[in-house]
Amino acid sequence: MPAVAANPCCVPAVYHRRQPERTLLYRVVQAHLATWLALHDDGQGGQTPVLTEREFRRYLECGILAHGFARARCPDCGHDFIVAYSCKGRGICPSCTTRRMVETAAHLTDHVFPRLPVRQWVLSLPKRLRYHLDDAELQNAVLHSLLRSIEGGLRQSLPETGGATHIGAVVFIHRFGGLLNAHLHFHVAMIDGVFRGEDAEPLQFQEVCLTPEQMAALQRTIRQRIVRLFVRRGILDKDEGQSMIDCEHDGGFSLNASVRIEANDRQGRERLLRYCARPAFAQERLRQLDPERLVYESKKPGPGGQVSVLLTPHQLLDRLAALIPPPRRHRHRYYGVLAPNSPHRSAVTALAAAESTKEEAKAETEDPPEIGRAHV
């Protein structure tokens, strides 16, 4: 007679294969990929990049048992089951990109960000400048200008007490908009304050909340520095740069810092990091009207107030191919005290690990310990 579970309320989880071949995206890619690749081969040497074709073909093999699987055994009940291999793609596969989003957010929450307030900064550039950000060197220069400006704005809002100041941030580079359109912009998850102290000293964290006036001044500073950077690179001439700086409506620059997560809101911090690490394509937003018409919807209005876009299968593949990230480029980067080469990284991130361990042992309803504003 089979053994009865000691706790009848505990129902064992049953593994179910996700069956990607039943999804709309899989059927569209499977039916139209060969034709789409043939149309992109113009017979004069022009063809789809190898990386793009490889991403699509690996997606068609992801989760399919015929392309390989591993056998697993449940240690509790002894039941055997098989798990299909995944493609581990970075741009197309909804399953792999979503899993990477969840793992990234969990890692940053549990092992990187200490229990301190976090603010999200989102920077978007005008279209005429945005298209030049495919240059990795220029992209890095824009990021450094943004972070130096924010650090300077935070430092100016503090009383002068001497000593060096440091920020801590993780930058996510998004190359997409809500309607699968190309839109390169930056999401910065930054500890909302500065750390004071020299390299050989323990750090003291000081929380900073900028006023609306200080935020507006910071936005003007960021716009000026980035425009001058483009002028120095020869992308804009001096007159064009000055006109963008003097524009009354921010000249197409957008800086949003309205989202702030409190220090003791661990779930909110993880939700924010999931949002920052989200993939370009959301499978649940794709609908099919007929075999030749697809609709992709956005949660927020896109360019011109659009909330959806009508696409043919080949147009969908065009948009997905354009959003595949370049190889050997990081999707997120660490800055300040969270940077790999920072002498303070181990001390700051140790707080995240300590808080993660404490939360496993205690209920989240308890008051958090006051470690964020003491010496790190």
Segments from the language model and where they lie:
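Beta->alpha loop/short-helix hinge microenvironment recognizer with preference
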Residues: 1-373
